[in-house]
Amino acid sequence: MTTNETNGFYKLSWAQRIGFGSGDLAQNLIFQTVACYLMIYLTTVLKINPAFVSGLILAVRLIDCFWSPIVGRYIDNRNPKLGKYRSYLLYGGIPLTIAACLLMLPQAATWSTNLKIVYATVSYTVLSMIYSVVNIPYGSIMASMTRDNDEVLILTSTRMVCANIGQIVVQAGFPIGLAMCVHTAIDWNQATFMAIGTIPAFVILPALPMLKKWLGKKGLYYTLLSIGLVGFAILFVIGKFFDVSSYNTLVQIAKVMTGVGLLVGSLMWALVPEVITEAEYRTGNRPAATVNALAGVAFKAGFSIAGWITPLVMGWIGFNFATEESALATDPMAWFTVTCIFAIVGFFLLMLCFMGSKENITTTPEKPVSFGEMWQEFKASKCLQLVLGIFVVVFLASFISGPVNAYYTKLANYSAIAQNAILVFTTIIPAILLIVVGGLIYKYPLTDERLDEINKEIEARSKA
C-alpha cells in the first residue's frame, strides 16, 4: 500500500467504479418509474383525483424529511460486518424490490375509490421509506472509497453515466413496454422525446475531467445551464407558435439541449464528498451518511414539490390528468408487468454494486450523532446550506416537467388552455429554476485549491 493510500488517497480500478455505479443504475430503474410515471398511473389508470395525488406525493415526501435523517443517523452510528454502508444494499435491496413490484398491482384498478386511495397511500409510503434505507448508505459509499479529488470526479462521472442509463431505459422503455404489452403501435416520437434529454450525459460525463480543467468548476456549470436555457426557449417557441409534429427534428435537438442544462443536477452529487470533507476538517468526524441523508432530503424535496405542484396547478390552469386523453396505454396488467421487470433487474444490479464496492475510509463517532448535532452541522456549514439549496431547485426543475413531457409531442390533441398548461411546465418553469441554480452556484465557496489545502491539513492531523 502506498503512502497516499494509507492517508486515504486511493486509486480505484474500473471494476470498482463500474461496480459502484451499477447501484445508481439500479435505483434509477425504480426512482424514475415513480418520478415520471406514478402520477400518470394513479390518475389515468386508477382514476384517482389529481388533487389527492398531489397531496399524497407531498405528504410522503414530508414524512421522508423526518425519516431520512433518522436513517442517516442510524447508519453513521453503526458499523455492520458486511460494511458500514454497502451492507444496506443487501439488507434493503430485497424489500425494495418487493415494494416496487407491489406499487402497481393490476387488481387495484377494480377496487373502490376509497380502497384505491388507501392502497396508493400505503404502497407509495412504504416504497419511499425503504428506498431511503438503500439510497442514503449508497450515496455514502463514494466518500468512503477515496479522498482523491480526481478519483472522486471519475467516480461521480461513472456513477452518473450509470444513473442516466437507468433514466433513459425507464423514460423511453416504459412507454415502449406498455405499448408492447397491449400490442399497440409504439409512438417513437414520444419515447424519444421522453428519453433523449439524457443523451448529453453519455457525452459530457466521460469528458468531465477534461471539461473541468478547461472551463473550471463553476465555468462548466454556467456553460451547461446556458445551453439548457436556449433549449427550453426553442421548445416554448415551437410549442406556442408552430405545429410540434412538423418540427420533430428541431424539437428533439432542443430536448437534448435542455438535458445539457439539467445535467447540472447530476453533477451536484460531486459536491457532496466536498461538503463531507469540509465537515471532517471542522469537526474531526466524517459524517458521510448524515450529509447524504440531508442531501437526500433536499433532492426529494425538489421531487416532492414538483409532484405536488404539477397536477394541482395544471388542474387550475385547465388540464385534468384524470379526464384528459391519456398519453400512454392504461391497461393495469401492462403497468404491473413493466414495473416488475425494472424492479427485478434493479435488484441484481444492487447485488453487483454490493460485490464491487470497497469501503476504504470510514469513521464511527465515539458517541452517537444526535439530531441536535445534525442541525448544528447544517447551521455551521454554508457549503452544506448552498448545496442543499441547489439540490432542491435543480431537481425541482428536472422533475416538474417529468410526467408532462409525455404530452408535449401530442400538443395538437389538446385545447388551447391545456396546451398553455403543458408549455408552462415543460419549458417556462424549468428555465426560471435553472437561472436560480446559476445564482446559487455563484455563491458556492469551495474551490479545488481550497479542497486540496483542507485534505492536506486533515492528512497532517492524522499523522500527528
Predicted regions and their residues:
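Membrane-embedded alpha-helical bundles of multi-pass transporters/translocases
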Residues: 2-464
